[in-house]
């Protein structure tokens, strides 16, 4: 499993900074977090959660869904065939179910998307997105260096322009990869259903 350290190493290789002379870990972690945030919005994790309803109440708290991006569907009651999807609304961390009859305390299954996580022990990124993340983070790191080196004396007068050009090319590639892999660009089968 790839960890934050592994991604940092990939970025250092891309940036030619294997000895950590230009970027410390904290700086790279900030750029990784920024790229991971963008990646998570374009290509979030797809998850389900089972939440217990309160008898007579149509509202469910979404605070237990860590990293929630969007609710895709709500099923109530659960474990029926065909599934009993219901209309719903979300507002300020609350999901309101709209079944014909108020819930009786049974479970509701929520289908949702969430942000990816990456730390020193684990990652939720699928392997095919690790290089996408490294591309974005390296672009942001190079952009920072280009910006900070504009007013500095350098042995090579084109240092800032070189990093800026490289960063722009990598950032363009990153955004194209996000667009290519984004959920909104994939055909997803959907069925119309009569609300329960």
Residue ranges with predicted function:
Residues 1-10, 27-41, 81-196:
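Internal mixed-charge
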Residues 8-18:
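DNA-recognition alpha helix
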Residues 35-37, 41-57:
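Extracellular ectodomain segments of secreted/surface proteins
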Residues 49-65, 119-127, 155-157:
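Surface-exposed ligand/attachment interfaces on beta-rich extracellular proteins
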Residues 55, 64-67, 90, 103:
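A generic structural signal for short, non-catalytic loop/turn and secondary-structure boundary residues
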Residues 61-81:
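Solvent-exposed beta-hairpin/edge-strand motifs
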């Amino acid at each position: 499993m790839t960890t934050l350290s592994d991604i940092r190493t990939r970025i250092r290789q891309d940036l030619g900074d294997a000895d950590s002379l230009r970027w410390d870990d904290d700086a790279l972690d900030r750029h990784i977090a920024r790229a991971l945030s963008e990646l998570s919005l374009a290509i979030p994790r797809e998850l389900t959660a089972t939440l217990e309803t309160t008898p007579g109440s149509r509202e469910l708290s979404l605070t237990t869904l860590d990293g929630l991006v969007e609710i895709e569907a709500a099923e109530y009651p659960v474990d029926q065939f065909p599934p009993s999807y219901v209309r719903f609304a979300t507002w300020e961390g609350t999901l309101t179910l709209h079944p014909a009859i108020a819930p009786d305390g049974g479970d509701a299954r929520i289908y949702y998307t969430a942000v990816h996580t990456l730390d020193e022990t684990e990652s939720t990124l699928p392997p095919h997105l690790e290089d996408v993340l490294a591309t974005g983070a390296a672009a942001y790191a190079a952009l920072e260096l280009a910006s900070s080196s504009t007013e500095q004396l350098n042995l090579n007068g084109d240092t800032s322009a070189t990093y800026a050009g490289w960063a722009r090319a990598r950032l363009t590639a990153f955004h194209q990869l996000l667009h290519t892999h984004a959920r909104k660009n994939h055909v997803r089968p959907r069925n119309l259903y009569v609300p329960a």
